[in-house]
Amino acid sequence: MKFSKRVLLRLKNKNKKLKPDKYKKLKRESVRGLIKGTVERPRLSVFRSNENIYAQIIDDTTAKTLVFCSTLDRDIKLNSENGRTCDASRLMGQKLAKLSIKKNITKIVFDRGPYLYHGRIKALADGARAGGLQF
Protein backbone atom coordinates (compact mmCIF):
# COMPACT_ATOMS: atom_id res chain seq x y z
CA MET A 1 0.00 0.00 0.00
CA LYS A 2 1.49 3.33 -1.06
CA PHE A 3 1.05 6.48 0.96
CA SER A 4 1.81 10.05 0.06
CA LYS A 5 4.57 11.85 1.94
CA ARG A 6 2.07 13.96 3.80
CA VAL A 7 0.16 10.89 5.00
CA LEU A 8 3.37 9.17 6.07
CA LEU A 9 4.46 12.18 8.09
CA ARG A 10 1.04 12.42 9.69
CA LEU A 11 1.23 8.75 10.68
CA LYS A 12 4.71 9.22 12.07
CA ASN A 13 3.79 12.26 14.11
CA LYS A 14 0.35 11.31 15.41
CA ASN A 15 -0.08 7.58 15.63
CA LYS A 16 3.51 6.38 15.66
CA LYS A 17 2.38 3.49 13.44
CA LEU A 18 5.02 4.05 10.80
CA LYS A 19 7.75 1.41 10.83
CA PRO A 20 11.34 2.65 11.04
CA ASP A 21 12.32 1.36 7.60
CA LYS A 22 9.42 3.22 5.95
CA TYR A 23 10.33 6.38 7.82
CA LYS A 24 13.96 6.00 6.72
CA LYS A 25 12.84 5.57 3.11
CA LEU A 26 10.66 8.67 3.36
CA LYS A 27 13.53 10.67 4.82
CA ARG A 28 15.92 9.50 2.09
CA GLU A 29 13.43 10.44 -0.63
CA SER A 30 12.86 13.87 0.86
CA VAL A 31 16.60 14.60 0.82
CA ARG A 32 17.10 13.04 -2.60
CA GLY A 33 14.24 15.08 -4.06
CA LEU A 34 16.34 18.19 -3.59
CA ILE A 35 19.56 16.71 -4.97
CA LYS A 36 20.19 15.68 -8.56
CA GLY A 37 23.51 14.72 -10.07
CA THR A 38 24.39 16.03 -13.52
CA VAL A 39 27.27 15.52 -15.90
CA GLU A 40 29.01 18.66 -14.59
CA ARG A 41 28.25 17.94 -10.91
CA PRO A 42 27.64 14.26 -10.18
CA ARG A 43 26.14 13.11 -6.89
CA LEU A 44 28.24 11.64 -4.06
CA SER A 45 25.94 9.09 -2.41
CA VAL A 46 26.79 7.65 1.01
CA PHE A 47 25.65 4.42 2.67
CA ARG A 48 26.57 3.69 6.27
CA SER A 49 26.32 0.30 7.93
CA ASN A 50 27.28 -0.65 11.46
CA GLU A 51 30.67 -1.95 10.38
CA ASN A 52 31.63 -0.01 7.23
CA ILE A 53 30.81 2.99 5.08
CA TYR A 54 30.40 3.05 1.31
CA ALA A 55 30.38 5.97 -1.11
CA GLN A 56 29.91 6.29 -4.83
CA ILE A 57 29.83 9.14 -7.29
CA ILE A 58 26.82 8.80 -9.59
CA ASP A 59 25.80 10.57 -12.79
CA ASP A 60 22.00 10.64 -12.52
CA THR A 61 21.41 11.58 -16.16
CA THR A 62 22.86 8.27 -17.36
CA ALA A 63 22.30 6.40 -14.06
CA LYS A 64 25.89 5.15 -13.94
CA THR A 65 28.39 4.92 -11.12
CA LEU A 66 31.56 6.80 -11.99
CA VAL A 67 33.70 6.16 -8.88
CA PHE A 68 33.23 3.79 -5.93
CA CYS A 69 35.08 3.45 -2.63
CA SER A 70 34.48 1.83 0.75
CA THR A 71 36.24 1.16 4.03
CA LEU A 72 36.71 -2.42 2.86
CA ASP A 73 39.43 -1.27 0.44
CA ARG A 74 42.86 -2.65 1.15
CA ASP A 75 44.63 0.70 1.66
CA ILE A 76 42.09 1.86 4.21
CA LYS A 77 42.04 -1.46 6.07
CA LEU A 78 45.81 -1.36 6.47
CA ASN A 79 45.81 2.20 7.84
CA SER A 80 42.93 1.88 10.31
CA GLU A 81 41.80 -0.64 12.89
CA ASN A 82 38.29 -1.07 11.54
CA GLY A 83 35.78 0.63 9.27
CA ARG A 84 33.69 2.03 12.10
CA THR A 85 35.94 4.96 12.95
CA CYS A 86 35.91 8.53 11.75
CA ASP A 87 39.57 8.18 10.77
CA ALA A 88 38.72 5.38 8.34
CA SER A 89 35.93 7.52 6.88
CA ARG A 90 38.30 10.46 6.46
CA LEU A 91 40.85 8.24 4.69
CA MET A 92 38.12 6.90 2.45
CA GLY A 93 37.01 10.42 1.56
CA GLN A 94 40.57 11.32 0.58
CA LYS A 95 40.92 8.18 -1.53
CA LEU A 96 37.56 8.85 -3.20
CA ALA A 97 38.70 12.38 -4.02
CA LYS A 98 41.94 11.06 -5.50
CA LEU A 99 40.07 8.54 -7.68
CA SER A 100 37.55 11.12 -8.86
CA ILE A 101 40.21 13.69 -9.73
CA LYS A 102 41.86 11.04 -11.92
CA LYS A 103 38.56 10.91 -13.84
CA ASN A 104 38.40 14.74 -14.07
CA ILE A 105 35.61 15.12 -11.50
CA THR A 106 36.22 18.05 -9.16
CA LYS A 107 32.76 19.44 -8.40
CA ILE A 108 30.10 17.21 -6.86
CA VAL A 109 26.80 17.34 -4.98
CA PHE A 110 26.86 15.64 -1.57
CA ASP A 111 23.94 13.28 -0.85
CA ARG A 112 24.01 12.22 2.79
CA GLY A 113 20.91 10.06 2.36
CA PRO A 114 18.83 9.53 5.51
CA TYR A 115 21.84 10.05 7.78
CA LEU A 116 22.62 13.13 9.81
CA TYR A 117 25.63 15.21 8.81
CA HIS A 118 27.56 14.08 11.87
CA GLY A 119 30.29 11.63 12.82
CA ARG A 120 31.43 9.31 10.04
CA ILE A 121 29.38 11.10 7.37
CA LYS A 122 30.96 14.43 8.27
CA ALA A 123 34.44 12.86 8.40
CA LEU A 124 33.95 11.43 4.91
CA ALA A 125 32.87 14.83 3.59
CA ASP A 126 35.83 16.56 5.26
CA GLY A 127 38.23 13.99 3.79
CA ALA A 128 36.77 14.48 0.32
CA ARG A 129 37.13 18.25 0.66
CA ALA A 130 40.71 17.85 1.86
CA GLY A 131 41.38 15.62 -1.15
CA GLY A 132 40.29 18.36 -3.55
CA LEU A 133 36.58 17.87 -4.22
CA GLN A 134 34.35 20.94 -4.15
CA PHE A 135 30.80 20.84 -2.78
Curated annotation (Swiss-Prot):
Which family, according to UniProt? Answer: Belongs to the universal ribosomal protein uL18 family.
Q: Does the keyword RNA-binding apply?
A: yes
List where in the cell it is found: Plastid, Chloroplast
**Where does this protein come from, organism-wise?**
Thalassiosira pseudonana (Marine diatom)
Statement: the UniProt record of this protein carries the keyword Repeat: no
What is this protein called in UniProt? Large ribosomal subunit protein uL18c
What UniProt keywords are attached to this protein's entry? Chloroplast, Plastid, Ribonucleoprotein, Ribosomal protein, RNA-binding, rRNA-binding
GO CC field: chloroplast; ribonucleoprotein complex; ribosome
Q: What is the lineage of its organism?
A: Eukaryota, Sar, Stramenopiles, Ochrophyta, Bacillariophyta
The UniProt entry, under Gene3D superfamilies, shows: 3.30.420.100
Name of the coding gene: rpl18
